[in-house]
Amino acid sequence: MEFGLSWVFLAAILKGVQCEVQLVESGGGLVQPGGSLRLSCAASGFTFSNSDMNWVHQAPGKGLEWVSGVSWNGSRTHYADSVKGRFIISRDNSRNTLYLQTNSLRAEDTAVYYCVR
């Protein structure tokens, strides 16, 4: 995997100002096998346009698994073999938003999806 994942557990405090990283996912739902969903992740509290971004997921009873990553400017994308050709990662730096278009969904794609830096 070309993109390293960094985990932020504490809000940074600089000169008395609290800077809280927020990543808010939306767009999930229940679909039939073969269906599609578009996931969104609204980012704030950091310079989104300078940051490589990733999607990970956690299937029921399992650990976190990397799904896809995109470079800061969207020019490079990478996918786990299990989703290659079915999922499309993209970003809109003007809206500080990351997307994951999920197509041809399978039962094994059932998971909680998170965006991470």
UniProtKB/Swiss-Prot annotation:
Stretch list, region Framework-3: 78-115
TM spans (from-to): none
Presence of the UniProt keyword Glycoprotein in the record: yes
Gene Ontology CC terms: extracellular region; immunoglobulin complex; plasma membrane
Complementarity-determining-2 as annotated region, ranges: 70-77
Region (Complementarity-determining-1): 45-52
GO MF assignments: antigen binding
Assembly, per entry: Immunoglobulins are composed of two identical heavy chains and two identical light chains; disulfide-linked.
Protein name: Probable non-functional immunoglobulin heavy variable 3-35
Organism field: Homo sapiens
